[in-house]
Structures are given as structure tokens and as C-alpha cells.
Amino acid sequence: MPLTLILCYGFVIILTALGCIFLALAFTDSTALLIKIWQFEPLHFEIALRIDSFANICALSICWIGALIFLYSSSYLKSYSRRISVICMLGLFAFSMLLTVLADNLILVFIAWELTSIFSYALISTEREKPEVRMAALSSLLITAGGGLGLLILAILSITFFGAASFSELEFYKDQIIAHPWSHTLLLLASFAAFSKSAQFPFSSWLPRAMAAPSPVSAYLHSATMVTLGVYLLVRLFPIFGSMELWTILLCTIGGLSFLVAGIRAFIAEKIKTILAHTTVSALGLMVLMLGIGSPYSVKAALVFYIVHALYKSSLFMLAGDFAKFQKSNTLQKLEEVDNFSFSSKLACILALAAMVGLPPLLAFISKELLIEATLNSKSALLLTALLIIANGFVTACALTIGWSILKPKKKKRKKHSLSPVSNFSLLTFPALILGILGIIFGVLAQEITEPILAEAYFNLIASDKELDLKLWHGFNFAFAVSTATLVFAAFLAIYRKSITKLKIILSLEELFLNGQKYFDFVVYRFSALCKIATSYFQTGKLTDYLVLNFIALACVLAVGAVTHSNFDMKNIIFPSEALLIGALLIIAGSVIILNSDSRAGGILSLALVGLGTTVVFVCSSAIDLALTQILVETLTLVIFVFIAIKVPKKYFSIGASSSAVSHFIALLIGASFAFLHMMALRSQESTEISEYYLTQSIPQAFGGNVVNVILVDFRSFDTFGEVLVLCIAALGVLALIRIIPQHKGNL
């Protein structure tokens, strides 16, 4: 069996088995399961998995949709040159996604969050020979990974202010967080991370570009998993920030804008995958809008729509890949020319598009009714209902247009595309068909299957025992009338699509407001130009300039840190003893002689004087072992310099720039800053858990009384080994350079 099939089927088995476990947990009435694996208390870092109701829903979609994607990939990637790397990256991405939704510790969530961005970058750039693919991958990485920094800062601030390093601890400190002066800042940081990950306005430009990735990648990452992480984060934080006014304003504004703008962009687009990308952004905006409303109706609608969108969008992306690769139909116009779709392709496409429209008896119909009910029962019912009709009308029009392009009778004059035999292979349509059938099952058996899965998550979010009450049919009510009006509006848009897309107002909106890619490219270009200017200014090629800049920056940092110390007082400064002053004077004298010496011998002996002063300092500090080591090092260095000095030109010891007033000032500044900070640190030195651990455990665990040596050779032996290894590699590198450099007489 080929390695491709072994990998694909292996991931199918693993993800299916994990999905069955999460499904079993979803049907149990148990509370959240917390599995602690390892923790490092000083940094508030803990590897712990929190498997609760909402984590079950997310993990279930990741596992089972992922299994179907790998099944689809086994056929789609058969002739792909980099299929092994794509499949392995997809597998790593799947497990990083699982870690993200199951992790409880905020720092662990951040690590997994950024891993998904890195794997997404690698998967998008599989065809890295193309410039547009590289730009798409870079756009994805910069926006999503950059947004993840907001999550990191949120974690740091929550640990600093409240000692809360996990979602469960944040919920415990809910009242303190809301009353804290930095509560709005924490919410803005979380929103920044969520909006960038879920491609919300104004960070939505990366997702349409990511369609440069192969279809299995788009079907998995950009429909049901990675792009929903932002929504996942908002759901996790809903019990904490959901009652804040800023939450409602921010999420309703950004979600509503994304919902509408992306819907219009999808309606204008011609490429199938681009249409699906924009409708994904629109759907994510709708979820954010529902969470922003924050009512029990909207939370229920968001949870149900989360499942609906994952089912139909991943199915459509798989079918779009089939059409583009094997039918050569990646645009609406080319799709209209294909006349011989297989029955399974047509059926899968009809089911997916019906879910996108929201037709009965699919779960999507229940979801649409809930969305309308949520807007009708909101505070701004008229505005939000109008927004829902207009934005959803554009998205529904896209579904009707794609469906009509596939199903409408073909004109005989048109050239028919021959259907590749590979595209009839069932594994290309079977996964999409399964997802469509699941949409029907979840709709028809909503109260028997869907409601038990979602009920506990719903209760936890709204903190109430209100029934979920998922019914397929609620009768002819006002919500049904709004749904009908939306469908009529969408049909009108689909019929007159070509005329509407040519209107000047649509074109001007696309040019000025909707095209975020141009603004992103502008920012990246200007930033690159700024970096070039900075590089040309700072990277002069002179070592003296580099040393000056680094020393000035270091001195400023040290000086500011010392002066702004909370307990700053001249009384806190501990001055050195007389013996230490002798060592310091030897070091200073040797340094001054080196700077002013014009002979090789004088410079070398002065350098030895500096080493002698350092040895005196070690002896005065009762560090005899360090003093002995220093003597050995200085002796060896002195011998080496004596041999090298014969070939060193005399001009190397000339005074030059090193004795200038600027150099002297910088040297004094950096020395004074180091000395001042060191004396302050000695005064304010506090015992930590780490230092106490080394002091108490050096004898019982490492059988050594010299704590410094024990740390180097026992507790941190791998660090020491790594340092030794680095020095050996550096020595080998220097030896290689010496051998390849032409030897000139009299010069080294």
C-alpha cells in the first residue's frame, strides 16, 4: 500500500476513534473533566486538558470532519508532488487544533493557537514557487500569529492582576475582572486575537488569499477548524465579558460589518473558492454578531449555526476542489459549461447548497429560524433584522447562483468538458455526501441527537435551565415570513446578478472599502520600505557603530531600571569592600593601559592585569573554584596571545577611535549603569522558590555542597553540555576559517 494511503487511513482511524470518545462524552451528563498532566507553578504554566460540553462540540467537529478530509485527500492528492508533507502537516494541524480547544491554561492555549498559524502557513505555501502563494501564506501568518500576541498579553495581564492562568480561573474571578480598571483592555486584547483568527473586519483579507492552498487544506482549515478559533475564544470568554456594554458594541459592530461586507464581496466574486471564502467570513461575522447580542436566543442560534456551517462549508470546499481540479471549472462561467456531473456530485452539492440557503428538513433550517428569532428579540430588532435579511440575502444568492450553474439545462452549442474518470471516484464525493446526510439527520432528529449534544453547553453559557427546544417546524410565524422575504430577496439578486455587479456603487464599494487586500499590501510594502531605511541607517558595516548603538541602548535600559526601582533610595545601595575595590582598580588600570598602549607586549600584559583583578574579585567573594578557573583561563589566554602577537600588525594597537571622548563617555556610562544596578540588586535581593529549591536539594539529590557546581553539572547539566557543544562547534568553525584563509606573510 502506498505511503499516502497509509498516512491518510491512519489519520482517519485515529480521528474517528477520538471522535467516538468525544461523542460518548457529549451524551453524558457529567461535569467538565479536567486532566492535569504537568505544571510549572512559578510561571503559572500547566499542561491540563479541560473536556467540557463546548470543548466536546469543537473536538467532535475537528475529529470527524478531519477524518472525512483525510479520506478525501487520499484520492485528491494522489498525483500531488508534495502529498506526503501536506498530509503530515494536516495531521499535525489537527492535533494542534485539538490541543487549542481542550487546553485550559491560557499560556498553553496561546502556544497551540500559534502552532495552528504556523501549520496553516506551511499548508498554504505548499506551492511556494508561485509569488501569489507566498504572499497569501505571509498574509495569513502575519495576521493570525500577530493577533495571537493579544492572547499572550491577555494571559500575562490576567496572571499579573488576578493570578488567573486558565479559563476556569477567569470565570471564578469574573466579578473582579469586570470591576477592574483594565477590564476594557483585557476585552480589547481578546477581541483582537479572535477577530484576526476568524478573519473579521478589518483583518479579513487573509482568508480569501488562503484559497491558494489545495482544496483539502481549505476544506479543513478555512471552513470548520482554524477560522472558528476566534469564535471559540469569544464563546469561552462570554460568561466573563458578556455582560459588559463594550462587548455588545464591539462584537455587534465588527460582526455586523463582516457579515454584510463579506456577503457583498462573495456576491461580486467569480471564482468558486473565493465565493466560499467570503461566505465563510460572512458566516463567522454572523456568529460574532449573535454572541454580541448576548441573549439566550442568540447564544442558541450561534451554537446551532456553528455546527451547520462546519457541515456545509467543508462539503462545498471539497466539491469545489473536485470541480477545479478534475472538471477544470474554478469559476461560475466555466461551471455553467460542464454538462456531465456525476450523480453523487450533484446530490452532495444540492445538499450542501440547501444547507447554505437554509431549507427544510436540514438542521440549517432550524438554525435560520433561530437566527431570525434572535434578531427579532434583540434590543435593536429592526436594525439587526434588516441587516440579517440584506447580508444573508447576498450569501443565499451566491448559493442559488452556484446551484443554478450546476443544475440548469446546458445549451447544445456550448462545448462540454469531458469528465475525468478520477472525478467519478467515490472518495471525492463520498465525504461531502456524508456531511450533507448528517445535516438532514441532525435536522430531522434535532431533539433526539442535536439537542443533547448542545444542551449542556447552552446551559453553561447562559447560566440558566432554559430549554434548548430545537424543533424542525414552528408553524407559519413572523420568523418564517422574514425567512421567506430573505429567500425572495436572494432570488432577485441571483437573477439580476450580472447587472447588479456592474453597478457603479458596487464597483466603487469594492474599490474603496471592500478590498482589504490592497490595504494590507500597502501596509506591508510601507513597512518593508521603512525596514530598508532603518537597515541602511543602522547596518553601516562598522563594528564600532554596532558597539556604540548596543552599549547606549543597554546603558539606557539599565539606568531607567535602576532609577525607577520601587524602593529606590541611596541608603539601599551596598558599596563594595576594600578588597573588592582593589580588584576593581586592577581591572580599571589594566583597561586604561590597554587603550593607551602602543606595544604588543604592553597590551598583552595589561590584559593579564584585567584577568588578575577579576580573580581578586572572585577570591574576595569566597568563590575559590571560580578564581582557580579564572587563573587557568587567563594563563592559557596569555600564552595564546603571545604566540598570536607575533603575526598581529602593530597598527591594531593604535589609539584611533577607541580613545575618543565619545567612546570614553559610553564606556563610563555602561560601567556606571552596571555597577549601580548591581548594587541595587544586592540590596533588594529576595529569595525565590527556584533558589530555595537549589539550596535545599543540592545535598540530598545531587550530593554536593557547592551549589554553583551542582547547578552546572547536575541540575542544569544539559544546559552546560549544550554550552560546551556550542563552544566546540565554534572552535571547529574558527579552525576551518583559519585553514581556508590565505596565509599572508606577517599577517594573521
PLM-predicted stretches and their roles:
Residues 24-35, 157-168, 358-371, 444-463, ...:
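Membrane-helix interface motif
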Residues 2-14, 136-145, 340-349, 422-437, ...:
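Alpha-helical transmembrane segments and their helix-start/interface "positive-inside/aromatic belt" motifs
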Residues 1-88, 160-179, 205, 236-238, ...:
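Transmembrane helix-loop-helix hairpins at membrane boundaries of multipass inner-membrane proteins
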Residues 68-109, 119-415, 419-424, 560, ...:
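Hydrophobic transmembrane alpha-helices and their helix-loop junctions in integral membrane proteins
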Residues 563, 574-583, 589-595, 649-748:
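Flexible extramembrane loops and terminal tails that flank transmembrane helices
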Residues 423-557, 670, 686-698:
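Membrane-interface and transmembrane segments of multi-pass membrane proteins
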Residues 39-57, 174-187, 374-386, 467-475, ...:
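Short aromatic-rich membrane-water interface segments that cap or initiate transmembrane helices
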Residues 10-24, 147-156, 350-357, 431-449, ...:
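Hydrophobic alpha-helical membrane-insertion segments
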